[in-house]
């Protein structure tokens, strides 16, 4: 069974040069909590930056970003502390309800993700979904005001939730209007952090991965925002079917990393190059003819190319698990309120 913690949430980012922003809230209930994992956790993110947190140990909603603490009054935190204490009890009851219907005992998890995205062209998206033991359980479709059930238990929940038209419309309005309004507000609070630009360091590596098979890697790291476009070109033409892609993932220092690779016959005379675009900055690196790396460092003042003979450079790859959650047979009576929690 997979245990997913919102505090460790990793977001995959679309491989694109179009800048987007998102607001997400995760809730997690655990049936058998311990000293490391609380019974209930709620965490909020703008993009990949934690902004709020609450858990069943502290029983307080608290800011995780200084620009949240500076801009929201104490009564905001107290109001949503009270709401989350209610959600804590609701999630605990709902998880027990699910365990009974699945005939489960022991350690199990119940998760919820709600949020929205603001795209560069001004368009928006919204999402609300739930999971049990890390697997999709039920997903809200705001356009049809309906729920997509993933199994027989979720289908019972679907029938109950779809009977409450007021709640369906409320969720749609929250996703399309209130969530976006709060996202724009938070983006203004954290402008210096969220609107900054750090261009990537890009490296190409040639390595024999199997006898008779050579792999070219193109790696980018140290960039923000996370939207980036990377492609391999062969003899001047883009290739896609032969390419393996890594996710765009946090590096742990407020920047991101990603990679892509392509296999080839080492006897081939084809010329491969990696093309990278990030926030209007374009970089092109040819694949090395011999084992080693070609490193390009992109800075605000210009681009410097360094040739470095390095072998076997590793990269930490994070794999994203879905962050979802919730289920119940009667729609919850704990209202989200005018602000996300």
UniProtKB/Swiss-Prot annotation:
Protein name (record): Major histocompatibility complex class I-related protein 1
High-level lineage: Eukaryota, Metazoa, Chordata, Craniata, Vertebrata
Function, as annotated: Antigen-presenting molecule specialized in displaying microbial pyrimidine-based metabolites to alpha-beta T cell receptors (TCR) on innate-type mucosal-associated invariant T (MAIT) cells. In complex with B2M preferentially presents riboflavin-derived metabolites to semi-invariant TRAV1 TCRs on MAIT cells, guiding immune surveillance of the microbial metabolome at mucosal epithelial barriers.
Binding site for 8-(9H-purin-6-yl)-2-oxa-8-azabicyclo[3.3.1]nona-3,6-diene-4,6-dicarbaldehyde: 25, 27, 61, 76, 112
Keyword terms: Cell membrane, Disulfide bond, Endoplasmic reticulum, Endosome, Glycoprotein, Golgi apparatus, Immunity, Immunoglobulin domain, Innate immunity, Membrane, MHC I, Signal, Transmembrane, Transmembrane helix
Biological process according to GO: antigen processing and presentation of exogenous antigen; antigen processing and presentation of peptide antigen via MHC class I; defense response to Gram-negative bacterium; defense response to Gram-positive bacterium; innate immune response; positive regulation of T cell mediated cytotoxicity directed against tumor cell target; T cell differentiation in thymus
Topology of the protein relative to the lipid bilayer: Single-pass type I membrane protein
Positions of the UniProt region annotated as Connecting peptide: 290-296
Result for mutant: residue 27 to V: Loss of MAIT cell activation
């Amino acid at each position: 069974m997979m245990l997913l913690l919102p505090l460790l949430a990793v977001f995959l980012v679309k491989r694109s040069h179009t800048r987007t922003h998102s607001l997400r809230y995760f809730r997690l209930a655990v049936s058998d909590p311990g000293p490391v994992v609380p019974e209930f956790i709620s965490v909020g993110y703008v993009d990949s930056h934690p902004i709020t947190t609450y858990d069943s140990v502290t029983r307080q909603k608290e800011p995780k970003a200084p620009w949240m603490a500076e801009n929201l009054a104490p009564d905001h935190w107290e109001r949503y502390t009270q709401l989350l204490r209610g959600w804590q009890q609701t999630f605990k009851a709902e998880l027990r309800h699910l365990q009974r219907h699945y005939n489960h005992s022991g350690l199990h998890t119940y998760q919820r993700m709600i949020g929205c995205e603001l795209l560069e062209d001004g368009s928006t998206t919204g999402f609300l979904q739930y999971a049990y033991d890390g697997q999709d359980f039920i997903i809200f479709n705001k356009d049809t005001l309906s729920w997509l059930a993933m199994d027989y238990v979720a289908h019972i929940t679907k029938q109950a939730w779809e009977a409450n038209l007021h709640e369906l419309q409320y969720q749609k309005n929250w996703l399309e209007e209130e969530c976006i309004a709060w996202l724009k507000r938070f983006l203004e609070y954290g402008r210096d952090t969220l609107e900054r630009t750090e261009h990537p360091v890009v490296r190409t590596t040639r390595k024999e991965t199997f006898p008779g098979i050579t792999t070219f890697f193109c790696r980018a790291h140290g960039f923000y925002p996370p939207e980036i476009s990377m492609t391999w070109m062969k003899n001047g033409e883009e290739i896609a079917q032969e390419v393996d892609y890594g996710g765009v993932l946090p590096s742990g220092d407020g920047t991101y990393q990603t990679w892509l690779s392509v296999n080839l016959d080492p006897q081939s005379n084809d010329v491969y190059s990696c093309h990278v675009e990030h926030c209007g900055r374009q970089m092109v690196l040819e694949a090395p003819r011999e084992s080693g790396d070609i490193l390009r460092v992109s800075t605000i003042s210009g681009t410097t190319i360094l040739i470095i003979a390095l072998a076997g450079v590793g990269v930490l790859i994070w794999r994203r698990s879905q962050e979802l959650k919730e289920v119940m047979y009667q729609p919850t009576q704990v209202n989200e309120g005018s602000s996300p929690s």
